[in-house]
């Protein structure tokens, strides 16, 4: 515990928690302080001026980060026949129909993304109480209910990120790893923020993008100067 406390103290040294840092500087400081024995995830959190309890203020979508997330994604696909073979060829980890649904009902959820062809939604729909709370329910708006399963699988494997605003008005996501170069992390953060801006709902009033913070898994959080993020408004 002493070593952990010493490392955390060192990570916070030289950090002004109240200051707003330019994006490149924030990335540099966060990455510099990601000293855990594993490859820490770099996370972005955004405070939005929305109330997601209202349907016209929901923020939800997907974004393909230019350099991926650094996370190995396991993908499950509900499909039959030729579409099942297409999913397997694209690199899906789990492909099936009723038998896959049975495994999930029994508590076996060994995947990070779930995709389904439209004809399989009758089967998948029965899994709503299991997949829904985990954010795994296939959704046509997110491109995970589709006949083009190959493209969906490849996008998930390449680091496509799904986002959804929480009740508190915060949306967050992993945008890379500490092992990424600073340039790649900056690119990914800007791509994510740009996607959130493009997903601005019609019912949003006042300031939409209120605050952006950056952190690593075990490190301090830093507030980012919005003016240094391309597309931030």
Swiss-Prot record:
The keyword Coiled coil does not apply. GO terms for cellular component: cytosolic large ribosomal subunit. One of its GO terms (biological process) is regulation of translation. PROSITE patterns: RIBOSOMAL_L1 (PS01199). Keywords: Repressor, Ribonucleoprotein, Ribosomal protein, RNA-binding, rRNA-binding, Translation regulation, tRNA-binding. It comes from the Bacteria. InterPro entries: Ribosom_uL1_bac-type, Ribosomal_uL1, Ribosomal_uL1-like, Ribosomal_uL1/biogenesis, Ribosomal_uL1_3-a/b-sand, Ribosomal_uL1_CS. GO terms for molecular function: rRNA binding; structural constituent of ribosome; tRNA binding. CDD domains: Ribosomal_L1. The keyword Disulfide bond does not apply. Belongs to the universal ribosomal protein uL1 family. Binds directly to 23S rRNA. The L1 stalk is quite mobile in the ribosome, and is involved in E site tRNA release. Part of the 50S ribosomal subunit. This is Large ribosomal subunit protein uL1. The gene is rplA.
């Amino acid at each position: 515990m002493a070593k952990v406390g010493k490392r955390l103290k060192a990570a916070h040294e030289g950090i002004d928690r109240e200051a707003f840092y330019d994006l490149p500087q924030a990335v540099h400081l966060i990455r510099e302080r990601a000293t855990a024995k594993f490859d820490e995830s770099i996370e972005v959190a955004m405070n939005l001026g929305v109330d997601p309890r209202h349907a016209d203020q929901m923020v939800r979508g997907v974004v393909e980060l230019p350099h991926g997330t650094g996370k190995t994604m396991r993908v499950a696909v509900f499909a039959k026949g030729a579409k099942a073979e297409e999913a397997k060829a694209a690199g899906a980890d789990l492909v099936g129909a009723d038998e896959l649904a049975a495994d999930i009902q029994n508590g076996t959820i060994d995947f990070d993304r779930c995709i389904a062809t439209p004809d399989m939604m009758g089967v998948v729909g029965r899994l709503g109480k299991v997949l829904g709370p985990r954010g795994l329910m296939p959704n046509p708006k997110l491109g995970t209910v589709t006949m083009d399963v190959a493209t969906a699988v490849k996008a998930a494997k390449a680091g496509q990120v799904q986002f959804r605003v929480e009740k508190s008005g915060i949306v967050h996501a992993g945008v890379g790893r500490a092992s990424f170069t600073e340039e790649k992390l900056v690119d990914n953060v800007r791509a994510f923020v740009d996607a959130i801006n493009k997903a601005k709902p019609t019912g949003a009033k006042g300031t939409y993008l209120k605050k952006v913070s950056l952190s690593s898994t075990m490190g301090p959080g830093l507030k980012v100067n919005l003016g240094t993020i391309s597309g931030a408004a």
